[in-house]
């Protein structure tokens, strides 16, 4: 255990290798495509925009992540620059739809497309979300939506996605800086303790509704930030239209020159997987 954490610390202090990151990203995409394209069709890559509508609505959204990154020995700005460069290369050289929308997170794109495809008969098909993020469990309410965690290497399953969403809104999301409904907006940025929510309260609120006043206000705050049904309508339309307008090119002629340019010999031998 100590050896592995020491090794990761040494790795973190070294400059990031663009070539290594590129190989890891491409090899992951190759793996997902070979594993899942037969059952789930084309690969659609969704990216976060730097600007996010949730941040406009709630200034403390994901605020703690900045703090964690500034304290990390990994150069996050360099990593983001490399990933942005690779994103542009994918759009230029590979036959996949690459989607990024001003003001939207990747989650918004995934949610809007999943809901649209699930609710439109002539679009309806099986969807696989490749992410371990439990925010997506609420989308499992549609039978055609499945989720696979690349970290755990297994499907994410929940018995009751509707109940999961309700509890998620009530409890908030510490990782995203969203407090529970009994806690004030600034609870995480001020390093305060949240007021705990009992199982009894959850059952009571589910049966009788959310009480008026501060709790109702906080519930609305969390619903706006967590419930994908709260994504602004205009943003949803932009996302859907961009997806429709992006034509998937079946042209793979740029992949080999791209691999050769970046000396991706190992992947050149697996060209057919892309």
What are these regions (language model features)?
Residues 1, 48, 132:
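Cofactor-binding loop segments of dinucleotide-utilizing enzymes, especially the Rossmann-like FAD-
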Residues 1-11:
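Single conserved hydrophobic/aromatic residue that forms the stacking wall/gate
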Residues 17-25, 102-107:
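Phosphate/oxyanion-binding active-site loops and adjacent basic polyanion-contact surfaces
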Residues 21-40, 89-91:
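A short, N-terminal amphipathic alpha-helix
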Residues 39-40, 66-274:
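Extended two-metal-dependent nuclease catalytic cores across DNA- and RNA-processing enzymes
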Residues 49-53, 134-137:
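Short, solvent-exposed loop/turn segments at secondary-structure junctions
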Residues 54-60, 138-142:
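A short acidic (Asp/Glu
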């Amino acid at each position: 255990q100590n050896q592995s954490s020491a090794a990761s610390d040494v790795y973190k202090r070294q400059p990031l290798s663009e070539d290594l990151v590129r190989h890891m990203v491409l090899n992951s995409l190759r793996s997902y495509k070979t594993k899942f394209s037969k059952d789930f069709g084309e690969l659609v890559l969704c990216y976060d925009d730097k600007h996010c509508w949730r941040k406009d609505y709630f200034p403390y959204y994901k605020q703690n992540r900045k703090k964690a990154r500034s304290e990390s020995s990994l150069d996050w700005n360099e990593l983001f620059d490399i990933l942005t460069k690779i994103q542009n290369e994918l759009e230029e050289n590979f036959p996949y739809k690459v989607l990024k929308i001003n003001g939207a997170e990747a989650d918004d794109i995934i949610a809007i497309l999943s809901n649209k495809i699930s609710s439109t008969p002539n679009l309806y098909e099986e969807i696989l979300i490749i992410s371990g993020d439990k925010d997506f469990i609420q989308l499992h309410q549609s039978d055609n939506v499945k989720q696979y965690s690349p970290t755990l290497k297994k499907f994410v399953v929940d018995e009751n996605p509707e109940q999961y969403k309700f509890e998620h809104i009530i409890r908030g999301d510490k990782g995203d800086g969203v407090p529970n409904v009994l806690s004030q907006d600034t609870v995480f940025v001020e390093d305060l303790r949240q007021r705990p929510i009992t199982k009894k309260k959850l059952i009571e609120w589910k049966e009788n509704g959310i009480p008026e006043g501060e709790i109702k206000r906080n519930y609305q705050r969390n619903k706006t930030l967590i419930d994908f049904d709260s994504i602004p309508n205009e943003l949803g339309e932009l996302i859907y239209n961009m997806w429709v307008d992006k034509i998937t090119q079946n042209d793979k002629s740029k992949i080999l020159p791209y691999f050769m340019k970046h000396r991706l010999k190992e992947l050149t031998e697996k060209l057919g997987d892309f």
